[in-house]
From Swiss-Prot:
Cleaved by the protease thrombin to yield monomers which, together with fibrinogen beta (FGB) and fibrinogen gamma (FGG), polymerize to form an insoluble fibrin matrix. Fibrin has a major function in hemostasis as one of the primary components of blood clots. In addition, functions during the early stages of wound repair to stabilize the lesion and guide cell migration during re-epithelialization. Was originally thought to be essential for platelet aggregation, based on in vitro studies using anticoagulated blood. A long coiled coil structure formed by 3 polypeptide chains connects the central nodule to the C-terminal domains (distal nodules). The long C-terminal ends of the alpha chains fold back, contributing a fourth strand to the coiled coil structure. The keyword Disulfide bond applies. Heterohexamer; disulfide linked. Contains 2 sets of 3 non-identical chains (alpha, beta and gamma). The 2 heterotrimers are in head to head conformation with the N-termini in a small central domain. One of its GO terms (biological process) is innate immune response. This is Fibrinogen alpha chain. Conversion of fibrinogen to fibrin is triggered by thrombin, which cleaves fibrinopeptides A and B from alpha and beta chains, and thus exposes the N-terminal polymerization sites responsible for the formation of the soft clot. The soft clot is converted into the hard clot by factor XIIIA which catalyzes the epsilon-(gamma-glutamyl)lysine cross-linking between gamma chains (stronger) and between alpha chains (weaker) of different monomers. It comes from the Eukaryota. It comes from Hylobates lar (Lar gibbon).
């Protein structure tokens, strides 16, 4: 989710 990699589709943590 909020990983900052590619799980931006979960909540918005990933920018890429």
């Amino acid at each position: 989710a909020d990983t900052g990699e590619g799980e931006f589709l979960a909540e918005g943590g990933g920018v890429r």
